[in-house]
Amino acid sequence: MPSSLEPSSKLALKGSSKIVCDYFEFALNSILYQRGIYPQEDFVTVKKYDLPMVINDDYDVQKYINNIMKQIKKWIYGSLMSKFIIVIVSKTNLENIERWEFNIETKDQEETTENGDGDGDGVGKSRQEIQKEIRTIIRQITSSVSYLPVLKDDDEYTFNVLVYTDPNTSVPIEWCDTQGDGKVLDGDNVDNVKFTSFSTDIHQVGTSVSYKYE
């Protein structure tokens, strides 16, 4: 637990948690943009990872995403979270169309202490190296529109965000999966694509998408 760590290790964990949370936030915005969940005019372009990235500029959506990331960052810092899920849902029949899964593993603290320098800045692995790995994944997410099924023009879509946490973690009621949205997509018409992963000296993050095709 963070309370038992040395001050330098706490700084390293805080820095790594921010890197992971930032990736989740920009990946979420990229998915919402690429999949047309919100109009393109709702997004603005910013520079991140030496890439032009999009973020939703609508006040209510931005507030919602910021609240999500604030809670997620706490769970990552506490090593209480193992998965971050984004589900794209049809508003017409409430069917889950796509399921984006981000797996997060916290490395063994002894291994981290041996390999890291504890400067809280991505530790032993350089920030440039981490960003290079993230750039690769972001490009893969962007290019995924070339094979993901086109969402139907005569339907509207929304998204749900879910997390997998430690069983003993206190989870706010709004995070509870009451509709079963977090379940894995099943059926003969489901495909899955795994992207490359990235890591800091503390966290390992994997990304994949499951989708239904005609």
Swiss-Prot record:
TM ranges: none
Cellular location(s): Nucleus
Primary location group: nucleus
Keywords from the named record: Cell cycle, Cell division, Mitosis, Nucleus, Virulence
GO biological-process terms attached to the record: biological process involved in interaction with host; cell division; cellular response to oxidative stress; mitotic DNA integrity checkpoint signaling; mitotic sister chromatid segregation; mitotic spindle assembly checkpoint signaling; positive regulation of protein autoubiquitination
Family: Belongs to the MAD2 family.
Subunit structure and binding partners: Component of the mitotic checkpoint complex (MCC).
Function description: Central component of the spindle assembly checkpoint which is a feedback control that prevents cells with incompletely assembled spindles from leaving mitosis. Plays a key role in virulence, probably through cell cycle checkpoint functions, especially those monitoring the integrity of DNA and chromosome segregation, which might be required for the pathogen to repair damage caused by host defense.
Name of the protein in its database record: Spindle assembly checkpoint component MAD2
Source species of the chain: Candida albicans (strain SC5314 / ATCC MYA-2876) (Yeast)
